[in-house]
């Protein structure tokens, strides 16, 4: 497959990650209940999840009585989601060009998906378009290291210290763009939403094994895995060693623990 754009990189990567992505869902699933809580009583609501992945949020919403529909551009993710949650409607779809009529849904959610899109502003506009008047769009992204995001800050610190970031990969949107106050205001207002609220969701990564932090990169990321694979063998081994040894600073009893809080934005049409 020819990888020419950031979208190509992400699409190809997530097609390959479907069977291993559950190594990170104990982390991402910590945001499910807070996301759904922004809609109040969801029983009977029609909610679209964009970038639905393995379908855990949709499955939780359906269990509470919502009419959930999940879309993802990775067919492998869609098939696994269908298998896990047969009572939910999952389909392949493009977040930047939703195949739904205007004002179709009461709610739209995007849990940690905006950072994987070529044109996230277009996706936010599409969410606004398919929402009914008074509907709500809620998204989550990772907080920056300065705002408590230890986990990804720690991993990238090891990569920067022992690797080379000047590599030949498609240009990517800024990873933390939608955790910035000015960028949030600009994107949400430009899409036409009438109001929004920002909050922080506590999320932590825990594991008994330091190697698990390295495995997260290879099994549950696309661009970070691509950065590592572009390194020399020696640099890659040095990065692995730095991650494993560096985790001792984050040991809590018999396990390792790092924070990676989520920034949650909930906007009303």
Question: Where are the language model's segments positioned?
Answer:
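Conserved class I S-adenosyl-L-methionine
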Residues: 1-43, 56-60, 76-80, 84
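Conserved Class I S-adenosyl-L-methionine
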Residues: 3, 28, 54-56, 174-269
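A structural alpha-helix within SAM-dependent methyltransferase catalytic domains
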Residues: 36, 59-62, 121-128, 156
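A short, aliphatic-rich alpha-helical micro-motif
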Residues: 41-42, 102, 124
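Class I SAM-dependent methyltransferase SAM/SAH-binding core
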Residues: 46-98, 107, 122
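A short SAM/SAH-binding and catalytic strip from SAM-dependent methyltransferases
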Residues: 106-120, 143
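Conserved catalytic/acceptor-binding region of the Class I
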Residues: 121, 129-132, 136-208, 224
């Amino acid at each position: 497959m020819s990888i020419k754009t950031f979208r190509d990189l992400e699409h190809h990567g997530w097609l390959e990650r479907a069977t291993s992505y559950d190594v990170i869902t104990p982390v991402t699933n910590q945001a499910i209940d807070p996301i759904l809580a922004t809609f109040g009583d969801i029983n009977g609501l029609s909610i679209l999840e964009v970038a639905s992945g393995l379908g855990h949020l949709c499955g939780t919403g359906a269990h509470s009585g919502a009419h959930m529909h999940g879309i993802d551009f990775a067919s492998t993710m869609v098939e696994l989601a269908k298998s896990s949650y047969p009572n939910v409607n999952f389909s392949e779809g493009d977040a930047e060009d939703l195949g739904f009529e205007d004002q179709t849904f009461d709610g739209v959610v995007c849990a940690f998906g905006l950072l994987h899109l070529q044109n996230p502003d277009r996706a936010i506009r599409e969410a606004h378009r398919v929402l009914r008047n008074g509907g709500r769009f809620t998204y989550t992204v990772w907080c920056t290291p300065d705002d408590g995001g230890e986990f990804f800050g720690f991993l990238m610190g090891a990569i920067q210290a022992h690797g080379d970031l000047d590599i030949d990969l498609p240009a990517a949107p800024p990873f933390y763009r939608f955790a910035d106050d000015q960028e949030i205001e600009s994107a949400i207002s430009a899409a036409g939403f009438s109001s929004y609220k920002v909050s922080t969701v506590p999320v932590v990564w825990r594991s008994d094994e330091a190697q698990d932090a390295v495995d997260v990169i290879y099994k549950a990321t696309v661009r970070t895995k691509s950065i590592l694979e572009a390194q020399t063998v020696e640099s890659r081994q040095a990065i692995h060693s730095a991650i494993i040894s560096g985790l001792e600073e984050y040991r809590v009893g018999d396990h390792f623990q790092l924070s990676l809080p989520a920034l949650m934005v909930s906007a009303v049409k």
